[in-house]
Amino acid sequence: MLILVGSKVIRVGGSFVKSNGQCNCLVRLFAAQIPSPPVAESQFQNEWDKALPYEKIPGPSRLTLIKDSLPGGKLATLNLGEVLEQYRHQYGNIYKISGGFGTPDTLFVFDPKDFETIYRTEGIWPFRPVLETVEHYRKKVRPDTFYSGGLGVEQGKEWAEFRTTVNPIMMQPKFVKLYIPQIDQFVDEFIIRMRKIRDSNIYELPENFEEEMDRWSLGATCLVALDSRLEIFGELDKNSREYELTAALKRFIYLRSVLDLKPSMWKVFPTADFKEMMRVLDVITDFSFHHVNEAKKRLESKVNTKSEKEQSVFEKLIRINPKTAVIMATDMFTAGVDTTSSAAISVLYNLAKNPDKQEILRNELRKILPEKGSPLTQQNMSNLPYLRASIKESLRVLPVVNGNSRKTGKDLVLKGYRIPKGTLVLLQSLYTQVDEKLYTGGKKFMPERWLKNQESELSKEARKVSPFTFLPFGFGPRMCIGRRLAELEIEVFVSKLVRNFYIEWDQPDLKFKTVGINVPDGKLQFKVKDVEN
């Protein structure tokens, strides 16, 4: 296939990729995601003519949804994930919630074949809905700080230009792996903290352990986002920047769900929640800006003796533009801390519920960590198939998000209905990735299905399933920019904890709720008993 990029023609799927310098990174990023050859125009027109009109797609109105969600309504006691599942049973694998109150229609799809169709036709500048409060803050309240809305706000050409700038830095495993020693040491400190806060008689962690997990994730993120080591465990001075940041991030998660994920009047007049959100974003932004300025002074005061490959992610970003570093830091705080924490919790929970799998992983880790305090390195982390299979399986069974979202890049026909270009679609993979028809023991935690060097029926089956069934970090040009960092943080965290502790769960099954992402809905009372050696 030949496509035009800038002023030059390039071959995709062949042996070369060429373009001018500005677009070259974008070409490399998008080349592997170029859609399959399109259906012949006449064939598509025939499908379109036979399809039912968009208006015939079943589903509730926005007003009905609001009414049913009020106290006493049939949806009042359900979380968002349960509501979507109930509608799926009622309407099938495609339905829409009609727009209203300034919001567009939202189409929900549940079939991996439809996921693939949408992704394959999204174009090189995919449109993904943004948090409008964050967009308002960056473009209306603090445009002096944010020369760009960043990856979480921008669309089209502006998004592509910013992604082109940061992608070679954020998505390169070799750059992220430079942080293994620092993250390893930080997890060692967290293990000391866990031993201190657990019950000395029954080895049970406190009910608020989720807050400790959030602090671990925040601290690990700061190592990369700001080249800063936070003293974040234990009691924090309420006047400290660290305390203000942790409090702000906690409120951000709540306010995001109230203002951006539910109907709100903030666009009509500034509600109390909206005003608080602006203050919260000020705290997060000012924290990032402070550390960027401090780092800039440090870099300017000393001769740079590091080669490019030795420079940290943060150093690379700040040398491009200090404001770019601020944008990426705030994005990592608002989009990465809670998701990484929740993902790590789900891995611990699945391993605790499956002690036989936990022991297999521990035996794998003993080979590279002969002592409980042995450090992780780039070299000894290079071959840990069961660790990575365990993390992947946990993200399948207990995903951090219900799916992904896009606006359709062209007119489509899905499930016999006409879907106009520009329709907002939510791709609900939460249900397909545990479907018993696709995965044997779909809801069971079985990491063996992802071991590439095995020829078990489980692994053979997993290889046959469409990859669009399960995409925990998204797909294509708008794939999660923090994927490499999140994977590394979780790998180091799980490795060190499993090598040090027998992780147990003797409570009722842990439930999760949807607040934009899926988070634990209950107390995290893990038991952690020391491994002898």
Regions inferred by a protein language model and the residue ranges of each:
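N-terminal membrane-proximal hinge/A-helix region immediately C-terminal to the signal-anchor transmembrane segment
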Residues: 11-14, 23-26, 30-144, 157, ...
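Cytochrome P450 catalytic-domain helical core, especially the substrate-recognition surface
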Residues: 55-85, 132-226, 240-297, 323-326, ...
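Conserved cytochrome P450 catalytic core segment spanning the I/J/K helices
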Residues: 64, 171, 276-344, 377-380, ...
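Conserved cytochrome P450 K-helix E-x-x-R motif and the immediately C-terminal K′/meander segment
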Residues: 70-95, 286, 374-415, 423, ...
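Cytochrome P450 heme-thiolate "Cys pocket" and heme-binding signature region
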Residues: 149, 453-490
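Central I-helix of cytochrome P450 enzymes
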Residues: 217, 221, 280-289, 315-364, ...
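Cytochrome P450 heme-binding "Cys pocket" and the immediately downstream C-terminal segment
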Residues: 355-357, 483-519
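Conserved cytochrome P450 K-helix/beta-meander segment immediately N-terminal to the heme-binding cysteine loop
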Residues: 427-460
